[in-house]
Amino acid sequence: MLARISAADDNGWVQCVSCGKKDHYKDMQGGHFIPKGHSSYWALKEENVHPQCPGCNMFGMRHGTASQAYTIWMQDYYGKDFVQNMLDSKGLPMKLYKKDYEDMLKDFRERIRHHEKRIGECRPTTNG
């Protein structure tokens, strides 16, 4: 959710990085540039997850057109060297401990709440 809501404008609209379709962030998905099953190192990194419409994320990536467009978007946004480094390092292991996950989750929740307030969709916080 963080990838979608942080990319949204103040009205909650976001653009698919593959096809350019605009929709509300709740109707989009977080598409992984390097698929989750291919890299434990990049699976939870923000640079690897960006808004995609369901068509591109679920079907387009399988047929090549969305993945090609995603690659071009990544190179334009981060630069070719960064993207090449991502691809070269996708086999690296990522060892996270329970505390790492807890800290990451806390950070993600805080940042999501910030963006919900920005968009005007603030939900009450829960303890825990």
Each predicted region: which residue ranges?
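Short Cys/His-rich Zn2+-coordinating modules
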Residues: 1-5, 33-39
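Short, charged surface segments at domain edges that flank catalytic/cofactor-binding sites
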Residues: 1-15
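Short beta-strand-alpha-helix junction that forms the catalytic/metal-binding core
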Residues: 14, 39-60
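Cys/His-coordinated zinc-binding microdomains
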Residues: 20, 34, 57
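Cys/His-rich microdomains that often coordinate metals
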Residues: 20-27, 60-63
